[in-house]
From Swiss-Prot:
Gene name in the database record: pcyA
PANTHER family given in the database record: PHYTOCHROMOBILIN:FERREDOXIN OXIDOREDUCTASE, CHLOROPLASTIC
Full protein name: Phycocyanobilin:ferredoxin oxidoreductase
Keyword ATP-binding part of the UniProt annotation: no
Lineage, opening ranks: Bacteria, Bacillati, Cyanobacteriota, Cyanophyceae, Synechococcales
Molecular functions (GO terms): cobalt ion binding; phycocyanobilin:ferredoxin oxidoreductase activity
GO BP: phytochromobilin biosynthetic process
Known function: Catalyzes the four-electron reduction of biliverdin IX-alpha (2-electron reduction at both the A and D rings); the reaction proceeds via an isolatable 2-electron intermediate, 181,182-dihydrobiliverdin.
Record key words, sorted: Oxidoreductase
Swiss-Prot/TrEMBL catalytic activity: (2R,3Z)-phycocyanobilin + 4 oxidized [2Fe-2S]-[ferredoxin] = biliverdin IXalpha + 4 reduced [2Fe-2S]-[ferredoxin] + 4 H(+)
Pfam family, one: Fe_bilin_red
Domain of life, source organism: Bacteria
UniProt source species: Synechococcus elongatus (strain ATCC 33912 / PCC 7942 / FACHB-805)
């Protein structure tokens, strides 16, 4: 297993993944004051391994800001057969904000799964009126290949979009909608006021923990990591990098 710096992984990935990764980081830079993520595990910035004889590469980019304890963008590639983007923004528990999440999975030139959502891990357990207004104002194209959410998907909002893009036009429309979600989120976060009530903060903490616990039930992700690196490493990666629980 290698943890050396890798240059150019993004450029090897499917164009939609490249474009979404670039757009995500540009949106962060525009709306937020980013700092390096203080709790980044030193050995998990770049990882290499083998999965069924194919080279597995994982690159993690993590930041923090006033509003978010962690902004995580993961890019991964398995040989020439599988490209992955995973992104989650974890609000600080002193901010009553939803969780932005986006995932792309592709292989052999096709995107098989594309999902984006703002999950309402908030005190009211639903998106605020400001979020609803912002999301409703976005262009909302029709997609043909809608996919069914997983059984643990009660964390997702009614705005969740989960598709298998059927054309370059649908890929472009998904990109625009995902970045629209993110811009609404960053705008709302930048304008948000920190919570001071201990009970409210405790409720946000409880909701974030539930979100992370549900996401950890994604058996597909865990199985890939276990095959490549073993059970213990996979568990550590799931709990310290992908869906670490807030402590504050």
């Amino acid at each position: 297993m290698s943890s050396s710096t890798q240059v150019g992984l993004k450029e090897q990935l499917h164009p939609l993944i490249r474009d979404l990764a670039t757009g995500i980081e540009a949106t962060w830079q525009r709306w937020l004051n980013l700092e390096p993520y203080a709790a980044m595990p030193a050995d998990l910035g770049y990882i290499e391994g083998k999965l069924e004889g194919e080279r597995l590469q994982i690159e993690n980019r993590c930041y923090q800001s006033r509003e978010f304890r962690k902004l995580h963008l993961e890019l991964a590639r398995v040989g020439n057969n599988l490209d992955i983007l995973h992104c989650v923004l974890f609000p600080r528990t002193t901010f009553d904000l939803p969780m932005f999440g986006a995932d792309l999975v592709g292989g052999r030139g096709q995107i098989s799964a594309a999902i984006v959502d703002l999950s309402p891990t908030t005190i009211a357990r639903e998106l605020s009126n400001d979020y609803i207004a912002g999301l409703t104002a976005l262009p909302n194209p029709t997609f043909q290949g809608l996919r069914e959410l997983p059984t643990w998907g009660d964390i997702f909002s009614s705005f969740c979009l989960f598709i298998r893009p059927g054309s370059p036009e649908e890929e472009a429309a998904f990109l625009d909608r995902a970045l629209g979600f993110l811009q609404v989120h960053c705008q709302q976060a930048a304008a948000a006021t920190a919570l001071t009530d201990p009970e409210a903060i405790a409720t946000v903490l409880e909701q974030q923990r539930y979100y992370c616990e549900q996401q950890r039930r994604n058996d597909k992700t865990r199985r890939v990591l276990e095959k490549a690196f073993g059970d213990d490493w996979a568990d550590r990666y799931m709990t310290t990098m992908l869906f670490d629980l807030p402590s504050d």
